[in-house]
Amino acid sequence: MSDLKSKRRNAPSLAQHTYPRRVSPENSVTLRHHRLARDASLQANSSRSQAATSSPRRNSSDESHDTGQSDANKWFDQSNLNPTANYDSNAMDVDPPFYQRESESSNEGGKIPYHGGSVPMLKPTVTHSSSADDYRSVIDDLTVEIQRLKEELKRYKQFGSDVMKNEKLFEIKVHGLPKRKKRELEATLRDFAASLAGTSSTDMASSHKKKSSRHMNRMQSSASGSMSKHASSSAGSHSRPVDSAYASMSTGPNSSGTSLNRPSMSARARTSEQKVENYLRDIPEGLYPRHMIMTEKERKKLIVRRLEQIFTGKMVRGANTSNSYQVNSGLTPVTHDGQSGKAAGLHQPPSLKAPPINVENIEPAREARILPADNMKKSRSRDNESTSNSNQDQTESGGKTANSGSGSNTSPPIAPPPEQRPTRPLDLDPHRTQVPSENMEYLRHLGLVPPELLPDSNDLEGDVAPDADGWIHLNLLCNLAQLHILNVTPDFIRSAVNEKSTKFQLSRDGRKVRWRGGLDGTRFSSDSSGDNSQSPVGDETDSSSKNGQRKKRKVVTADGQTTSAPSSKEASKYDRQISQSSDSFHYKPLFAHHPSSHETSLDTGSSYGPPEESAQGDSRWGLSGSGGTSQRKKRRVDGAIVYYSGAPFCTDLSGDPGDAGVDSQTGGISPATYMQNAGQAQAKAEARAEKGKVPPKAVRMVPIRSQSGSFLPHRPLTAFSPSTEDVPMSDVDEAIALEDDIEMEFPWSDSQQYLEVRPLEPSGLGGVLPDDNFMVVVTTKRPHGMEPGEKTPALGRTKSDETTRTTDSIVNLLASMSTSGNENMPAGRPVLHKTGNIEIEYLSGRIKRLNPVPLPPPAIFFPPFSSTSSYNSELDLGSDADDDESSEEFMSRRANPHQSDNEYPDDVDITSGDEVGEEPDDELAPTDDDEEMESAGDEGGASRGRAAGPRSARPSLPSGKSAGHRAVRRTGSLAATAGGEESGYSSSAEES
């Protein structure tokens, strides 16, 4: 072992002789560079420690530093010859070529080279990919969280309308509550919120009075001496008449002392703001813009109902929508003491009469007061005396009298006008309750219907003479009925009144109408179903009593108005009419989804209204609340139910799929029950048809979709079931009775079938007269439910035999008809015809003569070379035609100039027009010789054939020729010849 170590120790010396190219260790370049790199690393570590303790920047004493300039060549050599000396893992590999090295003045001794790359301030920022990915993931998570919080905040901040934000009372959230229980809770909370109508305003006013009581006392004490001075001046300044119905709220007797109540300006501002909010809140549903999809007949009926409602006072639908707002909106009719109720009662039902109401307990009226009818009869000129008397009555009823400061008045005394309130949206509701007495009073005030010329009560149902008075401009009634909402023209309104109304009399010029009298409007056929009922709630007409007097219970409401209530037998009908609203003017979905066995169509339906469209807890389309819910239940949001102070409705931001057609308040059927499936509607229609109430043809078939979504009643690619046509077979009066001993293995139809009569284009068929225009009516019999692949033994023939038999049957049929006239075919030998796999049996047939047809224009005209040759050829053709009377000649006859114009087969009759050379009878009217037929088969066939050929008194060649063809209907009927359209052409007009 020791020898081996000694050999290794002496190895470098031996290498000199063994390897002459190896140099000594002292002269080795690798070892020298290694030493230099080690020394450089030591110097770099020392300089790094010095840089951490002392700053290379300028000191606070503003002494300059010694700087040295680096040479580019020196930097290049140092970087290439000593690459490891400048290596630092946290710095750049080399220094820049012109880096200014800095050194402090306090440094002693040799200058240590300073490497700026080791200073952190001069290092470039290095981005680590791992840390960037971590930050990116955090940013993504925060973004998702922010989006989720935004959605949640949006869900919680759904306040509905901003107008009602100040009236917000409370809000609740419901989780997992059944729909019926939720309806009950909503109804209870709505009643509670509606009962707090004046609580908030009263508390606010009381607190304001407590705070300003001292100030009010001081103001009253200081203004007590000036009250007498300002009384007369204020009364005189506010005594000017106001003719407009939109009178300002500051006018009237109550506003005489407004200058003294300065501290109550804030309360007035709050009151005015509340009035504006109430104005915007009470917008009725009838004023919302909507697109109505109605037919022309429905629109005319609606126009007539609107016009007759002015005189009858009977609502079309939804009478309860405006009754609940009568107290708040001031729609309660005010009956004045001097009003003549007898004249107004002629056009007012007994249930709509209201007793006199104390004027002090209600708010001011919107309309300007009209003088009573008695005063108008006594004095039409409205002198000062009547004006002063009426004004005195008004001041006494208002409880305020004017203090006259002066003893004598140079001008007539003018009392302040009665107070008026501004017009509210509910006053313009087209579905509001109409009071006929007020409407008649307004028309009398305009001088259009004098009271003495109104029809008496005993002559209500009689007609009105056209020269009597009482005509009213139709434009005025259209404005009163607000028909501009329906977007109809005056001409359309005139046509509706003329066609649909039985209570209006239209003038000759169409500008005026007159009410014929009566308590009820026009009754339409659709009113019997109850959907389009014109009668108001509890006011159905009785056919037994002409004057409409019925025994009903009268209920006095809170405002003193009497309404008639139905009996217990009419409870269901009463509730059904209560729940009906103006949903007929809103959009209804065209397609109703078919419900499953455990879910109705209302559960999967949707409410299409905005959140502000709720009234009385039900939306326009019969769904609870007012929020819209989507058909996809995954997108539903559990929002809050917001209740407002004094509002009889709530805002349900979560939505409600709706009940199964039951109203929570009345217990009746909701208006949304019209969304029923097509199967139930079809069953009801068929049941009514079976009972005999509706004829079978009047039953409207409800389209039923198939699994593929098609409305077609048959599948043309899978089954052969020819569709029936709309043109009835009017030519056949009665069908021929079938023999009783015929046995069939397949079902037959005995009902009358509808045929299609297709006219043929005119063609110049050679040798056929224009009068030869006829139609072959054939009675056929065929199976109804035979399968496509089923065959009978009698039909097992070859194709050639079938074609031959078909041709022979047609020829024999025409030959028999030409020889025997209109006699029927023998029933013992029916003609069988096979089309595909369906057997067709021809029972009988006849020929019906039609009007002549015009000739088509000639395609090619050849002038005759000589009259003699053409005349001889025509004579030859005529002689051949006279000799041959076979069946083929009947199909295509040759032209014969010597034949008479009205020459027909012996046994075939002609019409009266053909006998005298005049125009024939009507084409569609059957002739005298047409035999009565009865369609006993499943489908009768009729085809029309017309043949036309050139005729002339001068013998010549035919102007146009074409090959004759037979037209066979797809149902099996046949046509003898090809012809053209009917035009009443007569052959006598051709002769010159």
Swiss-Prot record:
UniProt-annotated stretches for the region Disordered: 1-112, 199-276, 320-433, 515-637, 783-804, 872-992
GO biological process: circadian rhythm; regulation of DNA-templated transcription
Entry-linked InterPro entries: FRQ (IPR018554)
Pfam families: FRQ (PF09421)
Superkingdom classification of source: Eukaryota
Localization (cell): Nucleus
Keywords: Biological rhythms, Nucleus, Transcription, Transcription regulation
Span of the annotated motif Nuclear localization signal: 550-554
Basic and acidic residues composition bias: residue spans: 59-68, 363-385, 421-432
Biased composition (Polar residues): 42-58, 69-89, 247-264, 320-332, 386-412, 559-569
Cellular-component GO terms for this entry: cytoplasm; nucleus
Compositional bias annotation for Basic residues: 1-10, 207-217
Ranges of biased composition (kind: Acidic residues): 877-888, 915-937
Biased composition (Low complexity): 221-239, 525-535, 944-960, 975-992
The family this protein is said to belong to: Belongs to the FRQ family.
Function field: Circadian clock component involved in the generation of biological rhythms, in particular in rhythm stability, period length, and temperature compensation. Behaves as a negative element in circadian transcriptional loop.
Name listed for the protein in its UniProt record: Frequency clock protein
Annotated organism of origin: Leptosphaeria australiensis (Marine fungus)
